[in-house]
Amino acid sequence: MEPRESGKQRVAVLFGGQSTEHEVSLRSSMNVIRAIDRQKYDLTLIGVDKHGRWTLCDEQDYLLNADNPAAIRLAPARCYLAVVPGQSGAQLIDAANGQPFPSIDVAFSVLHGASGEDGSVQGLLRVLNIPYAGPDVLGSAVCMDKDMTKRVLRDAGVPVTPSVTLLRTGDAAPDVDAIIGQLGLPLFIKPASQGSSVGVSKVTDRAGFAAALALAFRYDAKVLVEQGISGREIETAVLGNDSPEVSVCGEILANDEFYAYDTKYLKGAQAGLVIPAALPAPIADALRQMAREAYLALGCSVMARVDFFLTDQGQILLNEVNTLPGFTSISMYPKLWEASGLDYPALVDRLIVLARASARQNAEIR
């Protein structure tokens, strides 16, 4: 798209959403908004409330309890938005009276979790001809479903954490002894399509299996039972489209039994992030190369965070791929790029540029 008369592109930051990660998304939005270069971009803030309604927000007062991770929330809506698709982008209008607002050139979504990073919003934005920061519909959908992620990666020859997939229809009473016999103990039981460790339980004996499974099924109709891995948690950040770059490696040192939601977002000081991770150069290179291979195999573009286990025996296992990583003050993705020489404002600018490039590529193959 051509720049506007002001010479600036208009970036819409989308945040909130209906998922269990609503509050995490609000926290991410603060950092992204702060980092956007106002000399280059005009800004539209779109908050999505827990009912799925799009609201036009004012940067000065769009959040309540912004300094409290447990109580942060959207301020009451001033007006609800509707979106009208057009040939050269989408037009925002006031849903009540049809009053138009400036059109959007690029969307920067931090709508974490269901509907926000599973391909739903990505599909909407693509239909609306709005470039957006993050993978396309397919890459987003596949990476959101941890079972499908593993299937694609196994086919691509990328080693993944051993697991068993259970469905709520038919597998609500699985053969626990057989699963323990196959995977051993401890086990991690998790919803297939949740993030931020929501609904995840560590199971150390047979007695805890049923409750952990019931919790996971509260959040998804598909559940993964994963082998507990003894080793280190290593993460990498990937950036780019056809020729992605990979950051330095970082390590998570969690004081809890695993890196749970509370540790990540409510008790951030209890989880240590070591960047760069203390790794032999050949291991770090292998991790970064595997991250790149997984990113391309899964059809990712613009950005993703790729998480690994490095076992006590030195084996690398890919744990999961997050196509819309956190941008909070404690989030690993921006910290990894900062350690790689790309500060927060430069990272956000790069993501916006990549979003536009990805949209141009998609338009050429229609």
From Swiss-Prot:
Catalytic activity from the UniProt record: 2 D-alanine + ATP = D-alanyl-D-alanine + ADP + phosphate + H(+)
Listed pathway(s): Cell wall biogenesis; peptidoglycan biosynthesis
UniProt-listed Pfam families: Dala_Dala_lig_C, Dala_Dala_lig_N
Residues annotated as signal peptide: none
EC category: ligase
Binding site for Mg(2+) 1: 307, 320
Binding site for ATP: 180-235
GO molecular function: ATP binding; D-alanine-D-alanine ligase activity; metal ion binding
GO biological process, one term: peptidoglycan biosynthetic process
The protein's Enzyme Commission number: 6.3.2.4
Domain of life: Bacteria
ATP-grasp domain span: 150-353
Function: Cell wall formation.
HAMAP family noted in UniProt: Dala_Dala_lig (MF_00047)
Protein name: D-alanine--D-alanine ligase
